[in-house]
Amino acid sequence: MNKDPVSEERAAAELLLARAAEQERAGDWPAAAGTLQEVLGRWPGLADTWYNLARMQRRCGEPEAALASYARALELGLDGPEEAHLNRGVIYADDLQCAELAQIELQRALALNPNYLPAWMNLANLHEDRGEREAARLAYERALALQPDHPETLARLTNASIIDRADDPLISRLRAALASTGTEWTQRAELGFALGRALDAVGEYAEAWRAYRTANSASRMSALAAGARYDRSAYARYVDALIAAFPAAAATQAPGETTPGRLQSQSVAPSPSPQPIFICGMFRSGSTLVEQILAAHPQVRRGGELPLLPAIVQEHFQPYPQACRSLDAARISAAATAYLQGIKRIHPGAQYITDKRPDNFHHIGLIKAMFPQARIVHTHRNALDNALSIWFLHLDHAMAYATDLGDITHHIREYQRLMRHWHTVYSQDLIDVDYESLVRSPETEVRRLLDALELPWEPACLEFYRQRSLVKTASVWQVREPLHRRSVGRWQNYATELEPWRQALTEAPV
């Protein structure tokens, strides 16, 4: 019996596609991309396969390749082309920081399908990131019209609005939605955080606290259901391991000695070009504000919260931080080169690029091994204000400590312990920026910061809020305003509620 060549080809393609799907489920995205490329090498006309290849390429950190693959899928007549345009828009906005091209792609998606809710949500979010409040609000309203009972849309519309009176209709809508949401934890969290923010804005502090408590409880249940929890003992052991991997003795030890954490040859790291400016500190400590100030300088380009350093840790330094107790020149050089290639892709030709990932304070020792001349900006603020600001935000499950004030307090104290160690080891290379001092005496503090970074004075740094570039953090609206003191001492509105944690948060500062 003769075999049907068409059936054989189809079976071969299906086998490879099944393998790629299994590789994706296993999280092996490079392997999945390789298998999909093998499929397309034999059957290049498969639009869906080009689409899936684009998804894998983006996950592999290849945004330009992903854009090209999405374009090929569109050329081949992909079903649901609005999804490809949406994904191209996300790449332009999140990976390449090209807001104009992102908006074009999102508008193309909406031209194909005016009722495509994800495109309206992403367009609204893009307007938020650009500081275009009214455009963001209108886009969220359009999205809400498509799905009036969508909790996330109502919450985001509230967050993009200026709430200045207690009878604002949005507050009533949030109360009603929260009362009818039932036990859907994610929805209750979204609505509760938005209601808390609105009530706080109009001075209804007691009800705001209750709304935030409901929101954090729901967020915590959602995190636990996803397997995310904050382990205080495990985090303390992690800080212990970081301190052991980069001991104070290594900073002053003579070359050739073998103290853990000392690079065998500190001359191997390539000269940074462009030069990274690392900005880190506790989340919600003013790091976005400092980045916005620096990005107003003509020699500095904004990098945002780059994933580069955590990716390098994952690839080159496992188990971390134990692997850093014995660093070799070749590994450090490879890591530094990979990092520099990553920031060059984001801003080719830039002289300085900011890397504002707050939790990079864990990696200060590794940063100094990769870039011995690096200056690291460390932002900090009043711990009570800091803790409250964290508790008031709906954060990713990766920050599992953020839903419980006891966990937040523990995390802050461990962060303070680690920063005291880094100050001992690298006292000349850490530039501390105190939020309260910055808003009280902005020109003095900005001049001090620029001097420490060996950058010339630039008056535009005091008018940072005039920039129209993308800002993709929870502080998106605050950094669009001139410096103000409204957030200083905010904890006093909730002094009674914060009393159980007050002593722990006010002792042993950085």
Q: How should these model regions be labeled?
A:
Residues R25-E38, C60-R72, E83, D94-R108, ...:
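Structural signature of tandem alpha-helical TPR/SEL1-like repeats
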Residues W43, G77-L78, L96, N113, ...:
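A structural motif in tetratricopeptide-repeat
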Residues G261, S267-A369:
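Phosphate-binding active sites in nucleotide-utilizing proteins
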Residues A12, L46, G80-P81, Y116, ...:
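Residue-level recognition of tetratricopeptide repeat
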Residues A139, T158, I171-G182, G192-S273, ...:
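PAPS-dependent sulfotransferases, especially Golgi type II membrane carbohydrate sulfotransferases
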